[in-house]
Amino acid sequence: MLRIYAPASSANISVGFDTLGAAISPIDGSLLGDVVQIESISSGFELESAGYFVRKLPKEPQKNIVYQAYVLFSEQLKLRGANVKPLRLTLEKNMPIGSGLGSSACSIVAALVALNQFHNEPFSKMELLEMMGELEGRISGSIHYDNVAPCYLGGVQFMVQSLGNICQKLPFFDNWYWVLAYPGIEVSTAEARAILPKSYTRQNVIAHGRHLGGFVHACHTHQENLAAIMMKDVIAEPYRESLLPNFAEVKQATRDLGALATGISGSGPTIFSIAPDLQTAIKLSSYLESHYLQNNEGFVHVCKVDNEGTREIK
């Protein structure tokens, strides 16, 4: 039996729409992510689901992304002249769906890594990553890697998608704390993408290029202040903030409390605030818990970048 944990991820990081993503884990050691357990059975295939957010999963197993991951893995294995072993997959759904924390990516990545390990790793990391992107595309409507790549590989990943590479790890600031606040409401990725304009002004395109280039340069040259200043979003945030509760007011308040940057995690509704130290992170956590959460489903976690990514757990 294998148990594979895939951590939450925060895509875009304000400045890198569809090109940046970070794997995130709470500093208290709790698991903010999905777990897939895989074990041998005598014949066939079985899928079971458990966990706090299991009630949010599709009722029909064929619509479950873990089932689709199993089917895709089986198809790819057959192309290599091999068959999938009889097995049972159990998804422990610990992540809210439509949260902006890479919930679908967690399930996809954990399932494919579990299947690959269970079959003695017939596929390379790059081949698995391509499968992950394909499955993510089925949910959001377009193939993108800014959740699956950091979730799988850990750290902050920059999507290059050239010269045979899907992504490359970006040096980052280990002393930064990420305060993640999920308000307890759902925003579908497809809905959040549909709200974006089909074209942008030249001014916004130039600003976006300047911010992204400046951010990547600052990461490589260890300039924290410059990196934080460059974390501006002219592509998605101006259009998506209407989907989030009191976003403009909350963003300003977090800045007043000492946040280096605040933005939308993925397509929302989770937001992130970057804190330079633990004391500021605790202040931000307290404020967001009081002013951003909308119901009992919501939560706030003080986190750091998870450099390990998807891994086997006991």
UniProtKB/Swiss-Prot annotation:
Q: What is its main location?
A: cytoplasm
Q: Which is a Gene Ontology cellular component entry for this protein?
A: cytoplasm
Q: For ATP, which residues are the binding ones? A: 96-106
- Which keywords fit this entry according to its UniProt record? Amino-acid biosynthesis, ATP-binding, Cytoplasm, Kinase, Nucleotide-binding, Threonine biosynthesis, Transferase
What Enzyme Commission number(s) appear in the record? 2.7.1.39
- Provide the GO biological process annotations: threonine biosynthetic process
Question: Would you say which domain of life the source belongs to?
Answer: Bacteria
Q: Which reaction does it catalyse?
A: L-homoserine + ATP = O-phospho-L-homoserine + ADP + H(+)
GO molecular function annotation = ATP binding; homoserine kinase activity
Give a Pfam family name.
GHMP_kinases_C
Spell out the subcellular localization from the entry.
Cytoplasm
Q: Which SUPFAM superfamilies does the UniProt entry name for this protein?
A: GHMP Kinase, C-terminal domain, Ribosomal protein S5 domain 2-like
Q: What class of enzyme is it?
A: transferase
Q: What pathway or pathways are given for this protein in its record? A: Amino-acid biosynthesis; L-threonine biosynthesis; L-threonine from L-aspartate: step 4/5
What InterPro entries would the database entry show? Answer: GHMP_kinase_C_dom, GHMP_kinase_C_sf, GHMP_kinase_N_dom, GHMP_knse_ATP-bd_CS, Homoserine_kinase, Ribosomal_Su5_D2-typ_SF, Ribsml_uS5_D2-typ_fold_subgr
NCBIfam families per the UniProt record, alphabetical: PRK01212.1-4, thrB
Family to which the UniProt record says this protein belongs:
Belongs to the GHMP kinase family. Homoserine kinase subfamily.
**Task of the protein:** Catalyzes the ATP-dependent phosphorylation of L-homoserine to L-homoserine phosphate.
What's the protein called, per UniProt? Homoserine kinase
Say which species the protein is native to.
Haemophilus influenzae (strain 86-028NP)
Q: Which gene encodes it?
A: thrB
